[in-house]
Swiss-Prot record:
Binds 1 divalent metal cation. Pfam families: Pirin, Pirin_C. This is Putative quercetin 2,3-dioxygenase PA3240. A divalent metal cation binds at residues 60, 62, 104, 106. PANTHER family: PIRIN (PTHR13903:SF8), PIRIN-RELATED (PTHR13903). Its cofactor is a divalent metal cation.
Length: 285
């Protein structure tokens, strides 16, 4: 008998403002971050109004985790203290490992038009929180994409995609949390059953349309809702009218999570050290 992953929780994000006043939806991020371990935060930006994004994210620090920015529409410029410069374009990805520390800015390269995309924060294990920082800019043409026999369009940002018929290695593979990150576009009547490792935390965020998680107790996920699933079993998705959904899966770290603004460590003492290091100019070296 097939065992399916159960929907444990449905979650709705809330309006938020970050950077110099950028308006966004904070899908996850806040109290009880252990529920989403190893994922710390997911922000969605989706606006046609330049006033919502034009101020951008001026220079600011990070320590202790990774950020993944995935752009659907619009253009965003990254610059950091290491001398990295990158222009995020539609379909592109930026994977930044803050680790010991990075100081960077993310500023829009446009004053009109749509700005749509996501930023995901992925935790690092304690042993790697003070490793050297890193940055990778992945051009749209270097992000693997495929279409299944059933007409589902798949963007494989991280990890390995396998639905039993098609396989594809993503743009990024990370050993710490073994993240899988897909953007799926299901047509009307579309179905897909991506294979994900048992033991991985699985999150689904539907950002267009709606879909159903199949199983003994099918659950429909509406637009702009996130589902947290059980860590074992098969995943089967279908959409009657069509949908776009982010699939996030990662190996939980099961370590203490202490966050203060842009710093994510394992203890209050480590947060205080990060604040001192930033004040003394040695956070990002």
């Amino acid at each position: 008998m097939t065992r399916y992953r159960d929907v444990l929780e449905l979650h709705t994000g809330h309006p938020a403002s970050d950077g110099a006043g950028v308006r966004l939806t904070r899908v996850i991020g806040g109290p009880s971050p252990e529920r989403f371990d190893p994922f710390l935060m997911l922000d969605q930006f989706d606006t046609q109004n330049p006033d919502d994004y034009v101020a951008g994210f001026p220079s600011h620090p990070h320590r202790g985790f990774e950020t993944v920015t995935y752009m659907l529409e619009g253009r965003m410029r990254h610059e950091d203290h290491l001398g990295n410069r990158g222009l995020l374009k539609p379909g592109g990805v930026q994977w930044m490992t803050a680790a010991h520390g990075i100081i960077h800015s993310e500023m829009p390269e446009q004053v009109e038009g749509a700005m749509r995309g996501f930023q995901l924060w992925v935790n690092l294990p304690a042993k790697n929180k003070l490793a050297p920082a890193g940055y990778r800019d992945i051009e749209p043409e270097d992000v693997p994409r495929l279409e299944t026999a059933g007409g589902v369009k798949v963007t494989v940002i991280a990890g390995r995609f396998d639905d039993g018929q098609a396989q594809q290695i993503g743009a990024v593979e990370r050993p710490d949390t073994e993240p899988h990150y897909y953007d799926l576009q299901l047509p009307a009547g579309g179905r897909i059953a991506p294979r994900l490792p048992d033991g991985h935390r699985v999150l689904l965020y539907v950002y267009e349309g709606s879909l159903t998680v199949e199983g003994e107790r099918p659950v429909e996920i509406a637009t702009n809702r996130l589902a947290r699933l059980s860590e074992e079993g098969e995943l089967s998705l279908r959409s009657e009218a069509g949908a776009r959904v982010l699939v996030l899966a990662g190996k939980p770290l099961h370590e203490p999570i202490v966050q203060y603004g842009p710093f994510v460590m394992n203890s209050r003492e480590e947060i205080e050290q990060a604040l001192r290091d930033y004040r003394d100019g040695v956070l990002a070296v």
